[in-house]
């Protein structure tokens, strides 16, 4: 019995649904696979590309380009680190992978799966709290009489419901000047680095490019969500604005890993009033 050709459906989100059928033990099963085509451009040296186009000979004379699984054994890809501290670099990468594997992103304000700085509910949390409990909002800081101190500190009300820290009595408004000033201080010390080599990760930037400006608070390389490859963009947060400005003048236009860097502030600076 011939097997029917698979049915392919194009989805609006750019994916494809492949529908096939199979029969096992007298029962027919429908199999739906959802796939996404990802195009990855690999940059190699010119001589490597030329060797790949060489004509094959011997037993592989008429074989198509590329390795043949039946006659070629693939080895393990070995990364060469030309650095005296390569052991420390490998240990740091291992620790970072372990930390990222056990760490989940949770907003401190609403508890959803996104960063606190990107929370879409910053400006309305206080208004919702006031509408739900006008008496507590009017009373200001302090604990309600019906809530024991131990439960109030842990965010548990008398009814057993959990209250986020931003909605507890005495909590600061996320849209207040204090929160906004803290965010602006972070932006004032942050630079964006453009035209980065795709092979440059956070450890490479810290150890080979940014070491004259230590201590570095944070280094983030922007990556493609689908492939995990670098987009050639990174954000670096320094200890203060003066150190960030020194790094800006030193790194902008400098060559790094065969590319010319472009460095600027993460947000445009507002000129001081005359």
UniProtKB/Swiss-Prot annotation:
Keywords on record: Cytoplasm, Initiation factor, Phosphoprotein, Protein biosynthesis, RNA-binding
Record-annotated RRM domain positions: 189-268
SUPFAM superfamilies with a match to the protein in the record: RNA-binding domain, RBD
GO molecular function: RNA binding; translation initiation factor activity
Composition skew (Basic and acidic residues), residue ranges: 170-184
Annotated stretches, region: Disordered: 138-184
Biased composition (Low complexity): 138-150
Alphabetized PANTHER family for the sequence: EUKARYOTIC TRANSLATION INITIATION FACTOR 3 SUBUNIT G (PTHR10352)
Quaternary organization: Component of the eukaryotic translation initiation factor 3 (eIF-3) complex.
Family named by the database record: Belongs to the eIF-3 subunit G family.
Protein name per Swiss-Prot or TrEMBL: Eukaryotic translation initiation factor 3 subunit G
Species of provenance: Candida glabrata (strain ATCC 2001 / BCRC 20586 / JCM 3761 / NBRC 0622 / NRRL Y-65 / CBS 138) (Yeast)
């Amino acid at each position: 019995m011939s097997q029917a050709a698979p049915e392919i459906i194009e989805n609006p989100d750019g994916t494809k649904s492949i529908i096939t059928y199979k029969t096992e033990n007298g029962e027919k099963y429908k199999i739906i696979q959802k796939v996404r085509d990802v195009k990855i451009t690999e940059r190699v040296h010119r001589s490597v590309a030329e060797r790949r186009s060489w004509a094959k000979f011997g037993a592989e004379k008429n074989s198509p380009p590329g390795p043949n699984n039946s006659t070629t054994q693939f080895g393990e890809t070995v990364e060469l680190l030309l650095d005296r501290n390569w052991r420390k670099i490998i240990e740091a990468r291992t620790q970072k992978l372990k930390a990222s594997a056990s760490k989940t992103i949770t907003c401190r304000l609403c508890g959803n799966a996104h960063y606190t700085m990107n929370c879409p509910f910053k400006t309305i949390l206080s208004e919702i709290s006031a509408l739900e409990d006008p008496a507590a909002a009017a009373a200001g800081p302090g604990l309600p009489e019906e809530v024991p101190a131990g439960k109030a500190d842990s965010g548990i009300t008398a009814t057993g419901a959990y209250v986020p820290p931003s909605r507890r009595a005495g909590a600061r408004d996320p849209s207040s000047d204090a929160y906004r000033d803290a965010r602006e201080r972070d932006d004032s010390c942050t630079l964006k680095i453009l035209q980065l080599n795709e092979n440059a990760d956070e450890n490479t930037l810290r150890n080979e490019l940014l070491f004259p400006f230590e201590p570095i608070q944070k280094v983030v390389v922007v990556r493609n969500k689908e492939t995990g490859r670098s987009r050639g963009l990174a954000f670096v947060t320094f200890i203060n604005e003066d150190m960030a400005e020194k790094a800006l003048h030193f790194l902008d236009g400098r060559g790094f890993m065969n590319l010319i860097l472009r460095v600027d502030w993460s947000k445009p600076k507002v000129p001081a009033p005359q």
